[in-house]
Amino acid sequence: MITTRFAPSPTGFLHVGNIRTALINWLYARHHHGRFVLRIDDTDSERSTEEYTQAIRADLAWLNLNPDVEYSQSKRSELYEIRFESLKAKGRIYPCYETPQELDLKRRIAIGRGLPPIYDRAALNLTIEERSELEEKGIKPHWRFRLDHDHAIKWNDLIRGEQRFDPKLLSDPVIRRADGSWLYLLPSVIDDIDMEITTIVRGEDHVSNTATQIQMFQALEAELPEFAHMALLTGGDAKISKRFGADSVADFKADHIEPIALEALLARIGTSDPVEVLTDLAPLVENFDFSHFSRAPARFDMAELKHLNARILHITPYEQVADRLPEAMDAHSWEVIRPNIDDLSEAAFWWSVVKEDIAKPDLSAEDKAYLVEAMAIAKTLDWSSNPWKEWIDILKKQSGRKGKALFLPLRLALTGQSHGPDMAGLLSLIGHEKAIKRLEQAVK
């Protein structure tokens, strides 16, 4: 069974790049009728918080990307210890004693000599006695995974195609700190094996991590999953990450963005497929295909999202928004108002225009005289059906007005606004009695 995972660290709120990663993993799993796993990567105990964990769950629920199962790495340390010891017994993990300052000096010297700034494996040359002396001085080791330099690292990426790394050009990665806490790389591999993750989908900034993790999979004698590395999103001139203040779910909610609008855009930018106006995720699931993804950076444009949000609302059925509309606003009212709104908050505004008192418009004497004429005609019409077209036709003939001069004074008098939803529809909501009252108020 195809199984994907979304593995955020609860050290901050999800940003748009995280949301895209979660979405693509969810879509791929659902396309193959597989499983979508949420794994909270909370090994960083100092920065991980329950508040952020709860926010991640809430954000995924808002996006309708509900996982089939959830795990927390903080509850899995026993398994990590077992695998750590097995790799140590195989000689694939070794202790190192350099301080951060010493490592930084080594990097700067290597760069100065025109060499790759990778770890020189000096710790492998320490004797047992030298290690004991260092530890007797109170120096606790951190631990590195020893890369196999004899075999090139290769995989066929679902997006990037054939990938090849020379392990000699990579540093043996630190996998455990001196205080015993875990870094990202090894627990991630252990969990991917244990959770039977078949496909790892993430940003292209993880490509070098994948190279080292492939050797960890092999050292643990596990079958390799497939990998798909997406081009990073860009917003303006910089890649998007939570450390650069990119939009979070809270920001999108504050901007009244519909979840489906965000998902419809994120699923298609950076692919050869057009962004579609959708009201549910089904078409994105059905048509999902990694072969349509580009290696070029994908630009996330907030203006494009807001435009898409409006277009989606214009076709959204009443049933999908009824619980978020003003009380007593029915399906007919929604159909009248929805073609003219950019976000759902505007529905409440137009409902108030229909149901509540409006400000008296500032009109010229000429327009007031025109409205007196309009009111007289309105009182003669049959309001059992919508009289708007008949009303306008008569006014046009009798007044000689046309275009803006014909329509705008009526709109101002009846709604207090210079633009908005179609007046025929609005008039059906305002009704005969209120329409006459507003015309009377406007000409006073």
Swiss-Prot record:
A motif ('HIGH' region) lies at residues 8-18. GO terms for cellular component: cytoplasm. Keywords: Aminoacyl-tRNA synthetase, ATP-binding, Cytoplasm, Ligase, Nucleotide-binding, Protein biosynthesis. It comes from the Bacteria. One of its GO terms (biological process) is glutamyl-tRNA aminoacylation. A motif ('KMSKS' region) lies at residues 239-243. The keyword 4Fe-4S does not apply. Its main location: cytoplasm. It is found in: Cytoplasm. Pfam families: Anticodon_2, tRNA-synt_1c. It catalyses: tRNA(Glu) + L-glutamate + ATP = L-glutamyl-tRNA(Glu) + AMP + diphosphate. GO terms for molecular function: ATP binding; glutamate-tRNA ligase activity; tRNA binding. PROSITE patterns: AA_TRNA_LIGASE_I. ATP binds at K242. Its EC number is 6.1.1.17. Coiled coil: none annotated. Catalyzes the attachment of glutamate to tRNA(Glu) in a two-step reaction: glutamate is first activated by ATP to form Glu-AMP and then transferred to the acceptor end of tRNA(Glu). Belongs to the class-I aminoacyl-tRNA synthetase family. Glutamate--tRNA ligase type 1 subfamily. NCBIfam families: gltX_bact. PANTHER family: GLUTAMATE--TRNA LIGASE (PTHR43311), GLUTAMATE--TRNA LIGASE, MITOCHONDRIAL-RELATED (PTHR43311:SF2). Monomer. This is Glutamate--tRNA ligase 1. It comes from Zymomonas mobilis subsp. mobilis (strain ATCC 31821 / ZM4 / CP4).
